[in-house]
Amino acid sequence: MLTKELVKEAREKAIRMLEKACIAITDEEKEKIEVTDFGLGVLYTFGLEILVYVNNERYCAKELVMFPRQICPEHRHPPIGSYLGKQETFRCRWGEVYLYVPGTPTPNPRARIPEEKKRYFTVWHEIVLRPGEQYTIPPNTLHWFQAGDEGAIVSEFSSQSIDEKDIFTDPNVKRIPEIV
């Protein structure tokens, strides 16, 4: 559960990171930055700061701001009716991000997962993204990612985003945050 104070703190930190990366955003966009702890109550371990520029039935563009070593838990974007599920391209803008997808598990991956949560991380093929590098994730594909030691900023370009329908491996995850 997030407090209003923690959301404000995280939003301000995300804004500073965007400024450091020379990514200009408007005052209105600063207020729209979403902060989620995925309902796990440990924002700086499991969390994400998200600025949605546009999201409609045809396409979506976002900035994903990640604090040092922050993790977005394993999930997939399933088909919904005639919609195939979200296809997304992650492009690293700043920092370093470790993305995990199905494939041959990477020996000695860079990610660090709390021991009590490891059972909820099942794909271990590592893709390291540095500024200027990108990777496209097909619809309905399990994936998760973690920022490097300095954090990361990732631009996401995708088909329509319906975050509330994402399916997480960890049954304790709540994608839409509860703020008190």
From Swiss-Prot:
Family per record: Belongs to the D-lyxose ketol-isomerase family.
Protein name listed in UniProt: D-lyxose ketol-isomerase
InterPro entries assigned: RmlC-like_jellyroll, RmlC_Cupin_sf
Practical and industrial applications: High substrate specificity, thermostability and solvent tolerance make this lyxose isomerase enzyme a good candidate for potential industrial applications.
Temperature-activity note from the record: Optimum temperature is higher than 95 degrees Celsius. Retains 60% of its activity after 60 minutes incubation at 80 degrees Celsius.
Natural source organism: Thermofilum sp. (strain ex4484_79)
Domain of life, source organism: Archaea
TM spans (from-to): none
Keywords assigned by UniProt, alphabetized: Carbohydrate metabolism, Disulfide bond, Isomerase, Manganese, Metal-binding
Binding of Mn(2+), residues: 75, 77, 88, 143
Keyword Manganese: yes
Uppermost EC category: isomerase
